[in-house]
Each structure stands twice: as C-alpha cells, then as structure tokens.
Curated annotation (Swiss-Prot):
Keywords: Ribonucleoprotein, Ribosomal protein. GO terms for biological process: translation. InterPro entries: Ribosomal_bL35, Ribosomal_bL35-like, Ribosomal_bL35_CS, Ribosomal_bL35_sf. SUPFAM superfamilies: L35p-like. The keyword Secreted does not apply. This is Large ribosomal subunit protein bL35. HAMAP family: Ribosomal_bL35.
Length: 66
C-alpha cells in the first residue's frame, strides 16, 4: 500500500501543536471590515485552535503524517 500524502491545501492552512491540537487562521477577515466593530476585528487577529471534533477530521483525513 502506498504512503498517504498530506493534502497540499491543508498544509498551507493548518498546523499541529505539540499536544496534537490543530491551529488554523481566524475566519471572517477577508472583506467587509468596515461594518464590523473594532472589538470584532481585534479579536479575530492571529490564529485559533479548532475544536476537538473538527481537529480529529483534519488530522485523520488531511494531515496523516502530522
């Protein structure tokens, strides 16, 4: 059986922490910032740790090699 390949789109969008959690960029920051409050824009900076159920899907299907 051949090796499982990591999805190339997933390796650009997700990272794994040392404990195996999945880190992704914040959603909702591409356009339309003028209608958002300053608090919303500020809170959407940086990255976000995905919930356990979503992280399990990403690790199993898209990042088999970590």
């Amino acid at each position: 059986m051949p090796k499982m390949k990591t999805k190339s789109g997933a390796k650009k969008r997700f990272r794994l922490t040392g404990t195996g959690k999945v880190i992704a960029g914040q959603a909702g920051k591409r356009h339309g910032m003028i209608k958002r409050t300053n608090k919303t824009i500020r809170n959407q900076r940086g990255t976000n740790i995905l919930c356990e159920s979503d992280g399990r899907i990403i690790r199993k299907s898209f990042l088999p090699n970590g």
